[in-house]
């Protein structure tokens, strides 16, 4: 029986330069999709998958994330005075329980692998999930919950994957495939942002992982890889070399790349159309522009 996945790491230290000037004074992860910030969707997904402890790897200028997941007593009192108990209940229901959240700093932006390494003291000796808020997942069963179910069968390390055009493989970590049953893929290696002509497949990793704690040893000794950064995929490759299984899961649902402006807009439209109050009005607005 595999150790359960109870902890999740949220790397939120990035500068969000692609969204300037909006992100000059606001963390990218706090940009709203309809009525919730990006990071909230990721935390809700983790809660739905059974995660009990939430670790945020932050940097300077990210205090709005801390505030978002804290109590706002003045706001709560105002809502009570105005009889908006339904809004208050919704806010409280979305908060993790006291003691479930912790924060650590990534003082220098050295890449995703380094950000994950910064959480080593919080994670300890347990498997853990990593969720990148840039990837907003729209799934009937939450993406991470699908991954946890798969992990209970496979053990080892696991990532959510998508298939992309070969020309786009240079943007992702790409799997070197051993076997593929149509949903679960076993990999013999992972290549970070390869030349498309040399990519071992077109199956690429997106921002959802379940990882074994042994990765911290490799991240501690890692040399900068692609882009001069400490790459998480390089350390995952070391675990594969040591005999740990690595699988990719074709999740059921849609992924929106909200680190890209068009992806952000698409997510806003898609979730807006699904919103029970806003959907009909948004359809009317969109039809006026098409």
Where do the protein language model's features map onto the residues?
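Positively charged, low-complexity intrinsically disordered leader regions
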Residues: 2-8, 280-287
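N-terminal glycine-rich phosphate-binding loop and ensuing alpha1 helix
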Residues: 2-80, 106, 142-146
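Residues at the starts of beta-strands that form the adenosine-phosphate
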Residues: 7, 52-54, 100, 127, ...
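Structural beta-sheet core signal
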Residues: 10, 56, 130, 159-160, ...
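Alpha-helix/helix-capping structural signal
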Residues: 14, 60, 135, 142, ...
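Conserved beta-strand scaffold positions in the cores of enzyme catalytic domains, especially
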Residues: 30, 101-103, 157, 246-248, ...
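Conserved beta-loop-beta/alpha segment of the NTase-like Rossmann-fold superfamily
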Residues: 74-78, 91-177, 211-213, 219-222
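Catalytic-core segments of class I nucleotidyltransferases/pyrophosphorylases
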Residues: 129, 148-152, 181-284
